[in-house]
Structure formats: C-alpha cells, structure tokens
Amino acid sequence: VKNDRINRRTFLKKSLFAVESLAILTGVSGLYGIFGERFWIQSTTVRLSYRRYPASFEGVRIVQFSDTHIGKYYSLEQMNKVVDLLQRQEPDIICFTGDLFDSKFGEVSDEVIPILSRLRAGMGKFAVLGNHDMRMDSDRVRDVLERSGFTVLVNESRSIERGNGRLQVVGIDEMLHGKPDLPLALKGVKRDDFVLLLAHEPDFADTSLASQVDLQLSGHSHGGQIRIPLYGSIFTPELGQKYPIGLHAFEGSEFHVYTNRGIGTTLFPIRFNCRPEITVFVLEKKLP
C-alpha cells in the first residue's frame, strides 16, 4: 500500500510538472510568435529553369513580397524596414501579390505612399489586389499603389523587353470578390513569350496550369501563419488550401506556383514555425 501511495504521489508530481512545463512552453511559444518570429523576415532565393525563358533575361532578379496587412498589427515603421530589406535584394522587377492593408486604414493610406515609393526596380514594380483590399476600398488601394509607382494589373499584362527577349507580367483579378479572366489577361501575349502571372490566391494555379503561364506568384495563405511540427498549418483560408506554402511543381509541365508566406498577419498577431518572407527568383533558360 505504501509503495502504491508513493507511485501515485510520484505520478501526480510528474503529471503536475508536465502540465506546468507545457503551460510554460505554450506561453514562451506564444511570446516568441507575437514578439519574435512575426518580425523575423526570411529572404528565400528560388532558382528555376525554363525552355521558354529568354536567355537575355538571365541574371534578372524578380523579388516578391505579399500580404503586408498594414494596420493594427503592422506599423508604418515596420513597413519601412521591409522596404529596406527589399532594396538590399537589388531587384530588377518587384512583384506585390496583394493585401496591402488589414483593416480600415484612414489617413495611413497616404502615409504609406512615400514608403513604397522608395522601392526601386529598373524593369518595373507590379501588383495585384488581395481579398482584404477588395473588401475595404479597392479603388483607394489601387490609387495608393499607383501613386507609389506600381503598375496594378487587373486581367491585363505588361511586356518587358531586354535584348531580343520578352517577358510578360500578367495580373489576374482577385478570385473571391473580383472577376478573374485569364484569357482576357493573356490577350496579345505571344505563344513563345515567357509568362509570369501574379494571382493573389494560390489555388488559381489549377487554371494557370491549363494555360501558357510559366510561373505563378501568389500569397493569401500566409503559409498557414501557425505551423505545428509534424502536422503543418492548423488553418488555411479558402482558395489557399491546395498550394498553401512554397514552391509547387506539376508533373509533365514546366509550370510552377510559388506561395509566399507574406509579411504581416491577420486575425491574430502571431506566427509560429512560419516566418514572414520575401522571395527572390533567379530564372535561367533551360538548355535543350
């Protein structure tokens, strides 16, 4: 009986210790996610080769950022630091894939213009709108981006020429609140042009795959924002569930979609095992 009491006492002590340790670990993880990881931006370099990629564009650096969600949980001061980091990547082309603001933005919309205007890219700055932008005031968000030097693409394309090669930057309308029309966006694009598509929601890739799009850049999902080891993200939004994070290839095709983890947060100001990200794409022509 005495040994049984000792075993029970030992079990209770160990159980209490385990519960306390878990609570402490959860608290530490929460603090890390709120005050640490969500500001610890990772620069990811992705190298890809394509038969259709023009040799004259080799060495061009395409830099993507997404989902800044400027507002309650992401300040203009923090956005200034993002711009500094983007510029250090020496971009030739800058692509923003939507959700500039997180909530009603008031006068902060004008204050962000000089910050975004500091971004320099010799071949252009391009953007599409996200679902948060569409829900609030898409015309105003578009105006902010355009006054900051971005070309906002809505079912349309822009051609970039270098040497004897040409690259088409195509932007699709937002899927949840807009009217995406890929055939319209590709109108005038020649069959041998390399096509870089900006689409806020990554699951648009299923449509892109059946077209002449070569590389789709997306955001929206934040990579899940909170990712549990050995499990993955605990939540991904509508149209961000099939291709929620990183690079995805498709059998029998050179087409890829890359889902950027974004800069800011939404719903809760926390990231765990899912650092904010900017992505640098270095593409090259695939030899026969």
Task: Label the predicted regions.
Residues V1-L22:
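N-terminal secretory signal peptides and thylakoid transit peptides that target proteins
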Residues T44-R47, E111-P180, K187-V189:
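Extended active-site neighborhood of metal-dependent phosphoesterases/phosphodiesterases
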Residues V60-V141, S148:
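Membrane-embedded segments
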Residues P202-V282, L287:
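Conserved beta-sheet core of the metallophosphoesterase superfamily
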